[in-house]
C-alpha cells in the first residue's frame, strides 16, 4: 500500500523530465518572454511593451538629460551625470542619448577616487623633495627626495631637484657645501679677491678726489669774483706839458691827500679840459 504511491510519484517525475519542452534559445540582442524571443531596445531607447505573437518590441527614445548606453529592456532611462563645480568638477564632454556626461577635475586638482565623484588640490613637494611625476586629472603629484648633489628650496607641484652649482666651472671656489635644500655657495679665492678689490677701491678714491677738486675750483672762482668786481671803464686823461706855453708858468696844483697819505683822485677829464680852454 505504501510502495504504490511512491512508485507512481517516481514514474511521474521521470516522464515529466523526459517529455519536458526544451527552453527557448534567443539571440544575443533578444530576450525570452512567454516562449517568444523579443528584440532588445537599442542604446538611447527604453522598453515600452514586450513583443507578442503579432507585434514587435515597442521602444521609446530617452528624454532630454537621459541616456541608455547598451541594448536593453529597461523601463526607465538613466539621468546624465552632474559635474558639480563646488566639488572641483567640470564637464569634459556633454552627454547624449546613448552616452553619459564625462566630468574631469579643474586645473590644479585631481580625482579623489576612480569614479571621480570629487576632486582635491595637487600635493606640493616640500623643500628637499622634487617632483618625480607631475599630477594629472586622475593622479596626484609623486615626489622623491633630492639625492646627493641635488637640491630643492621651494614647495612646488612642478619643480624637480636641481643640480648643485659647479664653482670650478665658474673659476670660483666653494665656500659653503650644498644640502638637499640649499645650493652650493661659491666665492673668489683670496688672491683673486685682492686683485679685484684694489682696483675698485682706487677707482672710487680717484672719483672722489676728482669731484672734490672740481668743487674746490668752482668755489674759488666764485669767491674771486665777489672780492674783485670788474673795474669801471675810465676816460683817458690828456697830459699837457707846461713848457709848451710861453709866459710865466703857474705853480703846479697841489694834490690833496687824505689820511694815511693817500692821494685824492682827481675827477676824470676836468684838468685836461681847462688847459685846453686856456690854450685857446
UniProtKB/Swiss-Prot annotation:
InterPro entries: TNFR/NGFR_Cys_rich_reg, TNFR_5, TNFRSF5, TNFRSF5_N. It comes from the Eukaryota. Residues 21-194 are extracellular. Residues 216-280 are cytoplasmic. GO terms for cellular component: CD40 receptor complex; external side of plasma membrane. TNFR-Cys repeats lie at residues 25-60, 61-103, 104-144, 145-187. Glycans are attached at residues 153, 180. It is found in: Membrane. Gene3D superfamilies: Tumor Necrosis Factor Receptor, subunit A, domain 2 (2.10.50.10). Receptor for TNFSF5/CD40LG. Transduces TRAF6- and MAP3K8-mediated signals that activate ERK in macrophages and B cells, leading to induction of immunoglobulin secretion. This is Tumor necrosis factor receptor superfamily member 5. The gene is CD40.
Amino acid at each position: 500500500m505504501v510502495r504504490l504511491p511512491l512508485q507512481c510519484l517516481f514514474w511521474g517525475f521521470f516522464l515529466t523530465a523526459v517529455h519536458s519542452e526544451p527552453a527557448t534559445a534567443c539571440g544575443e540582442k533578444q530576450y525570452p518572454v512567454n516562449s517568444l524571443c523579443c528584440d532588445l531596445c537599442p542604446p538611447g531607447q527604453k522598453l515600452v511593451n514586450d513583443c507578442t505573437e503579432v507585434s514587435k518590441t515597442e521602444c521609446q527614445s530617452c528624454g532630454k538629460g537621459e541616456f541608455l548606453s547598451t541594448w536593453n529592456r529597461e523601463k526607465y532611462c538613466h539621468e546624465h551625470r552632474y559635474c558639480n563645480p563646488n566639488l572641483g568638477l567640470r564637464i569634459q564632454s556633454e552627454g547624449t542619448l546613448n552616452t553619459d556626461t564625462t566630468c574631469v577635475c579643474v586645473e590644479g586638482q585631481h580625482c579623489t577616487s576612480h569614479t571621480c565623484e570629487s576632486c582635491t588640490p595637487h600635493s606640493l613637494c616640500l623643500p628637499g623633495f622634487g617632483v618625480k611625476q607631475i599630477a594629472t586629472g586622475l593622479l596626484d603629484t609623486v615626489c622623491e627626495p633630492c639625492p646627493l648633489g641635488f637640491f630643492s628650496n621651494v614647495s612646488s607641484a612642478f619643480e624637480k631637484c636641481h643640480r648643485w652649482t659647479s664653482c670650478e666651472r665658474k673659476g670660483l671656489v666653494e665656500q659653503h657645501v650644498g644640502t638637499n635644500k640649499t645650493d652650493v655657495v661659491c666665492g673668489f679665492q683670496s688672491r683673486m679677491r685682492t686683485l679685484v678689490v684694489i682696483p675698485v677701491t682706487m677707482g672710487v678714491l680717484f672719483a672722489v678726489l676728482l669731484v672734490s677738486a672740481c668743487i674746490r675750483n668752482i668755489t674759488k672762482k666764485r669767491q674771486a669774483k665777489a672780492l674783485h668786481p670788474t673795474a669801471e671803464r675810465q676816460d683817458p686823461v690828456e697830459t699837457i706839458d707846461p713848457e709848451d706855453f710861453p709866459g710865466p708858468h703857474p705853480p703846479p696844483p697841489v694834490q690833496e691827500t687824505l689820511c694815511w697819505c693817500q692821494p685824492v683822485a682827481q675827477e676824470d677829464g676836468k684838468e685836461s679840459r681847462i688847459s685846453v680852454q686856456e690854450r685857446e
